[in-house]
């Protein structure tokens, strides 16, 4: 016993010594460089609408969109013969059918997905519902659509627990009950696109870094997949391809406005709780320990455009942004600054009424009322 205690004490001493190792001089603190303010001051966003010397809005959109794609690095190669889907399972729900699919979105891989199709005669309007991050990678599509009966009981239980963040209501099922075809896919590293060793948040950044060694960007692959999945959605016979929207909250909101900016199929979008400016996101003043990360990182893009400038590429798309006044991830000062930039863009094109921005008295969340507001917006614009 004494020998075991001695070994344990030695191990603890070693661990504490390693954790406590510090030098008098350093260059990084709280995961940011000490010269972060200087980096921010050097960001002038020369390609932003109003900063760029391009004065024709259509020409600017094409140039800005191409710059985003350039910074996203190469896309995954499209599958030969177009997108193909295999139906894995189907079940009837209250007013709509639910299917589990495997969609060949790339020559490299298939993407697991759920699709919900309302009963009755189509074609129907459709919404690509994009799941969040939540530092929880075990489930993806199951965060926004109730798992089908073919899934493991652990997946079903986990999804039901996660739905508590939506006040017990699955966002996708809610839209399907109200007449929309709904698609939800797993993003890379989530759900059935995760690690063989199991879902571990601490491995995400390491894998993203490894992917960059292949000359590709994992965050970009997520966006490329969202674009491809929307193209697949538009090809479904049950879908009116002229009436497609997208929505999501947290990382799903980021995915939604990125998709609206980069895909002409999107006619309306509702991002909930993800919009800010880089000067507020990457600042020391909010005492955060995580400021962004690989989930929304395209190399070099910030030298040209900030988040609201990228979202502005979507104009004149109808968009409703909802953020929370109590959201500690997205401080109101940065949110409002971003909203103001976007409003200037929509108003410059005479379509100011097609951009709605709201700050609610809520934390980082997507309650039933936000889902109801999104449904109302989609009914109006799709």
Model feature map: region roles:
Residues 248-260:
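Glycine-rich nucleophile elbow surrounding the catalytic serine of serine-hydrolase chemistry
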Residues 21-70, 74:
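N-terminal pre-domain segments of enzymes
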Residues 122, 129-224, 234-235, 280-283:
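Cap/lid segment of the alpha/beta-hydrolase catalytic domain
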